Amino acid sequence: MTTFDIGSPLIAIAQKTRKAASKLAILSTEAKNQAIIAIAQALESAKDEILQANIADCEAANAEGIPKPLYKRLQLDEHKLRDAIVGVQDVGKLDDPVGKVQIHRELDTGLILKRITCPLGVLGIIFEARPEAAIQIASLAIKSGNGVILKCGKEAVRSCEAIVKAIKQGLSHTAVNPDTVQLLTTREETLELLKLDKYVDLIIPRGSNSFVRFVQENTRIPVLGHADGICHLYIDKAADISKAVPITVDAKAQYPAVCNAIETLLVHQSIATEFLPKVADALQERHVELRGDKRTLKILPNIVSATEIDWETEYSDYILSIKIVDSIEDAIAHINEYGSRHTDAIITEDSTSVETFFGLVNSANIFHNCSTRFADGFRYGFGAEVGISTQQMPPRGPVGLEGLVTYKYQMTGDGHIVATYTGANAKAFTHRDLV
């Protein structure tokens, strides 16, 4: 039970969301898809209002001197907004994850068991900066039959208010109750949200490791943690340098403020002398600050010396740490010690090295000969994602529709009783799968 005032405004919001979600859970796929189309259209119509709200957020954030990586995530230009709207449309085209029959089994003649997917209920999503996350999450929640309570960071309040206003306007002309999507905007509401175990079924915090731990320690609601992205790229001794250089540049500099950009480059000692000067030139052309261990400094004497803190830091900026390793085993040991189990990649032409890396690196996303920036629900074909889970238990990696449903067992009989199947003359079950 929650312990704070039953008259709390947030309680009332959560109750409305729960009620709306219970009706959404049984809506047809067609009705949900119509709602998603309406959301995309409403966002398109409100494009100018949303972009102006974001400009106001960015101006206020700039005046307050927020960190550069956070500012980059906050910015929502026309290109980002268009991509987010396309993502909504893509979610509408995906298969409905609700109502899937996972098990269809005859236990005995006339006694049939089914396991069928169903919505979780109400999601509580806490995120900072990225206002387009509200768009992605709302579309996924509706397609998966869930209500959602969004809690944005203070720096993105104006943007998210404009976005959620448009979403609710779109839903108002559909079978989906606009109360399905709610927005919270104050820090105090975060703590209140974490107490709503009676009304919220899953909390997804998107932020630092310390923030995710804070959430986990202050709620009885299950938590799906989206934490730091300390991602690594390992350049193996059998790497093709013509691939390794552009992949490194893309993984670091294409968009350094996101969680799937690399923070540490590990280089096999046998290829370091040839590879490092080339990649350093390419990275420095993109204004990336390089920090290296002692062995790296012998090859690149003009870069900054790396410290122990660098190996465990998510810069989310144009900074990259470099370490030379003696073997693939050393690279894997470094990744498993300092990484965040988000995304790590190997560049090599040796299949044995790939097999070793894939088998021993304990991360949600493990890549070969491609950029870590591909670790994304949209790029995986999920339409969008509510976050990237770095926990060991599923769902893991980019969490799309399939990660937002659970299942229930349904059994139909015809007067069957357990006594028939117990005792000395117990009847045997047939246990025959029907699908």
From Swiss-Prot:
Its main location: cytoplasm. GO terms for biological process: L-proline biosynthetic process. One of its GO terms (molecular function) is glutamate-5-semialdehyde dehydrogenase activity. Keywords: Amino-acid biosynthesis, Cytoplasm, NADP, Oxidoreductase, Proline biosynthesis. One of its GO terms (cellular component) is cytoplasm. InterPro entries: Ald_DH/histidinol_DH, Ald_DH_C, Ald_DH_N, Aldehyde_DH_dom, G-glutamylP_reductase_CS, Glu-5-SA_DH, GPR_dom. Its EC number is 1.2.1.41. It catalyses: L-glutamate 5-semialdehyde + phosphate + NADP(+) = L-glutamyl 5-phosphate + NADPH + H(+). Pfam families: Aldedh. It is an enzyme of class 1 (oxidoreductase). Pathway: Amino-acid biosynthesis; L-proline biosynthesis; L-glutamate 5-semialdehyde from L-glutamate: step 2/2. It is found in: Cytoplasm. SUPFAM superfamilies: ALDH-like. Belongs to the gamma-glutamyl phosphate reductase family. Catalyzes the NADPH-dependent reduction of L-glutamate 5-phosphate into L-glutamate 5-semialdehyde and phosphate. The product spontaneously undergoes cyclization to form 1-pyrroline-5-carboxylate. PANTHER family: DELTA-1-PYRROLINE-5-CARBOXYLATE SYNTHASE, GLUTAMATE SEMIALDEHYDE DEHYDROGENASE. This is Gamma-glutamyl phosphate reductase. It comes from Nostoc punctiforme (strain ATCC 29133 / PCC 73102). The gene is proA.
